[in-house]
Amino acid sequence: MALKITQIKGTVGTKPKHRDNLRSLGLKRIRHTVIRPDTPEVRGMILAVRHLIVVEEVAGE
């Protein structure tokens, strides 16, 4: 199982830790989409920035 992650809000005014989490996920700008494996580490980063992103489950790796 993989996760499709799309950034929907910008990083202006957010905490540095949230910006670091977005960078670690590979997100750089609004409407940028990446596909990441469904691991506990990725889920933790998603939880921290859930107000800035949208997550969808996709089949495959």
Curated annotation (Swiss-Prot):
Q: Which residues form a coiled coil?
A: none
For this protein, the record's CDD domains field holds: Ribosomal_L30 (cd01658)
Name by which UniProt lists this protein: Large ribosomal subunit protein uL30
Gene name for this UniProt entry: rpmD
A biological process (GO) of this protein is: translation
Q: Which NCBIfam families match?
A: rpmD_bact
UniProt keyword terms in alphabetical order:
Ribonucleoprotein, Ribosomal protein
- The chain's disulfide connectivity reads none
Q: Name one GO molecular function term.
A: structural constituent of ribosome
Per the record, a Pfam family?
A: Ribosomal_L30
- Write the lineage as a comma-separated list: Bacteria, Bacillati, Actinomycetota, Actinomycetes, Mycobacteriales
Cellular compartments per GO CC: cytosolic large ribosomal subunit
Question: What does the similarity note say?
Answer: Belongs to the universal ribosomal protein uL30 family.
Q: How does it assemble?
A: Part of the 50S ribosomal subunit.
Instruction: Provide the species name.
Output: Corynebacterium glutamicum (strain R)
